[in-house]
A protein has these predicted regions:
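Short proline/glycine-enriched turn/loop motifs at strand-loop junctions of beta-rich domains
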Residues: 42-49, 56-58, 549-552
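Catalytic cores of secreted or luminal carbohydrate-active enzymes
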Residues: 475-496
Length: 605
């Protein structure tokens, strides 16, 4: 059956080729039409293209080519559930490929593309209507890997874990779940960061409708969903995007630019159709799956050639990132765009400058590295590393930072968080409570990887479930309870989030006492004021003094040595001081304490 409806799409296709489109998924791939599907594939340099699948009895059907716009097309009596493949012919070479715009595919075996039902009906209107970028709201992100959060054998479906995940997230007072990539990928140990299907939900976790339902159910329970997407590179498998039309269609032809350090292939954003392809991918996931945020992986490898600052800024990529973020911000103004960027490139979260990349948030890798380094050092030598704690606030207001303790820090012999702490078994738990208090009360939004909340002693392994049984040990159960309560205090007190990016929201009270490694600071918002005291050394203080020039009452809200967390400080303190008096606190070794600061009339009320 010959249908020539494609002629009506030429303006859209021209926009796509020129890099101006974010709706490529509505133009290419399998498009429903009458009782079947139209298949369109952009491959300008291919000599011929064939399609075969369940609907052709796996016989080759030749596709027509529009030579002016460089795409192939065909109508087939295909239906939902049919698998298919493309055969691309160039200079006599016949190569089977997956459809770049396939919505699903087989991740193993014969890597065929799959036609799926795309008419899922969401029930999350209220949540989507009220969501925001959370600049002045609490955002405490729980990062998970679908396949190993709770593993039931070889493969885990989204819907296998969703009910238990919701219970855990709500109980722990997290606000969002961030999901490591679920775009289709062939090599499981890549964790999804080397993809072959930029519009396909990985079949190892279910079909697209399963993921949509997963997001929908989370939204109905008040939980936001952020997805990791990869824009810097794609998998090196021959059947994916690699030399798709017999030429370097998606990648650079120049030696030194094609391959990344991981052996994957870098996207070439000097090409208009590549820009449109990736903008369309981002738009597809946001629009079709109701995502609340996208975390863009390895941004530093886009900013600089293969992430090497000595090779200079990659101007084509800079322009693309800025264009991508402007496009998405206009189409989806309440969806967050988050950069995982380890570079010192400026203006990552700036939307006004020509050089600004336009992200909403940037991971603070400097804070993460400095903090971990500090806690790895022996307590008695920490005075020499004092600036590892103080330095973050020197640059914090340059960007809109998010504080991550992510999967990258607990894998490949880097050790789990508990084993990064210096000292013996007992003192590691004490220090990890201090570190988490520091993270949750420091300005900036928060992220923790699954397992951090129970102080697991295991490095993360994508082939194994988190060892939840460890909570049967009192010390881990106590730690988990502390994290839950700490998260609750963060979530319910505006001082800890409303003014994250306003310099008036933070003030050091004790910042220069390197000899004792005691730090103290206030967090403030309208009608909300707190004092955070952190003893980061194995040193007891019978009466550590803080000068205040006000009549105040200090009401302790959480202390890491409370008996409910395995400690022996029985009563939370309430201390009243008059103007000119000092606040005097007993501080135990590795103690974290958070006080609400009230004036007398506030206490009375």
């Amino acid at each position: 059956m010959q249908i020539n409806i494609i002629e009506t799409d030429h303006e859209q296709i021209e926009n796509y080729i020129n890099g101006h489109a974010s709706n490529g998924h509505e133009i290419f791939g399998p498009i429903p039409y009458e009782d079947g599907y139209i298949f369109r594939v952009y491959a300008p340099n291919a000599d011929q293209m064939f399609i075969k699948g369940d609907f052709t009895n796996w016989e080759n059907h030749q596709m027509s080519k529009n030579p002016e716009y460089g795409y192939f097309y065909i109508y087939e009596n295909a239906k939902i559930g049919d698998f298919y493949k493309l055969i691309v012919v160039k200079d006599g070479n016949w190569v089977e490929h997956t459809d770049p715009f396939a919505r699903a595919m087989d991740h193993e075996g014969d890597f065929a593309s799959l036609i799926v039902d795309e008419n899922y009906n969401f029930n999350d209107d209220e949540f989507v209507k009220n969501r925001s970028k959370n600049f002045d709201k609490p955002m405490n992100i729980y990062e998970i890997h679908i396949g190993s959060w709770l593993r039931y054998g070889q493969n885990v479906n989204f819907l296998d874990i969703v009910d238990k995940l919701i219970v855990h997230v709500k109980e722990m007072n997290y606000t969002h779940v961030e999901i490591m990539p679920v775009t289709e990928y062939p090599f499981y140990p890549s964790w999804g960061y080397q993809s072959t299907g930029f519009f396909a939900t990985s079949s190892r976790y279910g079909r697209p409708d399963d993921f949509k339902k997963f997001v929908d159910i989370l939204h109905q329970n008040g939980i936001g969903v952020i997805l990791d997407l990869v824009a810097v590179h794609f998998a090196n498998d021959y059947y994916g995007l690699k030399t798709f039309d017999g030429t370097h269609l998606y990648e650079s032809p120049y030696e030194g630019l094609t391959y990344s350090e991981w052996g994957s292939i870098n996207f070439d954003y000097s090409k208009g159709h590549v820009r449109s392809f990736m903008k369309s991918s981002f738009a597809y996931w946001i629009e079709k799956f109701h995502l609340d945020g996208i975390r863009v992986d390895a941004v530093s490898y886009m900013i600089y050639y293969n992430g090497n600052e000595n090779r200079g800024v990659h101007e084509d990529n800079i322009k693309f990132i800025s264009d991508l973020n402007k496009t998405l911000a206009k189409k989806y103004p309440n969806v967050m765009l988050i950069a995982e960027d380890s570079s010192s490139y400026p203006l990552v979260t700036n939307k006004n400058s020509d050089q600004g990349l336009g992200f909403d948030y940037k991971w603070d890798m400097g804070w993460m590295n400095d903090t971990i380094k500090y806690f790895e050092v022996d307590s008695f030598n920490r005075s020499m590393y004092h600036n590892k704690i103080t330095f973050s606030m020197f640059y914090f207001y340059n960007e809109r930072f998010l504080l991550p303790l992510s999967h990258d820090e607990v894998v490949h012999l880097k050790k789990p968080m508990i084993n990064k702490m210096n000292g013996d078994y007992e003192n590691r738990f004490k220090q990890l409570k201090v570190l988490n208090t520091y993270q949750m009360t420091h300005p900036g939004k928060k992220l923790n990887f699954m397992g951090n909340e129970i102080a697991t002693f295991d490095e993360w392994n994508e082939n194994e479930s988190i060892n939840w049984d460890i909570k049967n040990y009192p010390v881990h159960d106590d730690f988990n309870r502390f994290i839950k309560d700490l998260n609750c205090i963060y979530k319910n007190n505006s001082a800890f989030f409303a003014n994250d990016y306003d310099e008036n929201g933070f003030e050091w009270i004790i910042v220069d006492d390197a000899n004792t490694s005691v730090f103290a600071y206030e967090r403030r918002a309208e009608n909300s004021r707190f004092l955070v005291v952190l003893n980061m050394a194995n040193m007891y203080h019978g009466g550590y003094e803080f000068a205040y020039d006000e009549d105040l009452i200090f009401v302790e809200k959480i202390n890491s040595f409370n008996p409910k967390y395995g400690g022996a400080k029985n009563d939370y303190r309430e201390i009243e001081i008059r103007k000119g008096e000092v606040l005097r606190l007993e501080l135990w070794e590795y103690e974290a304490a958070v006080f609400e600061i009230l004036k007398k009339d506030e206490k009375t009320n």
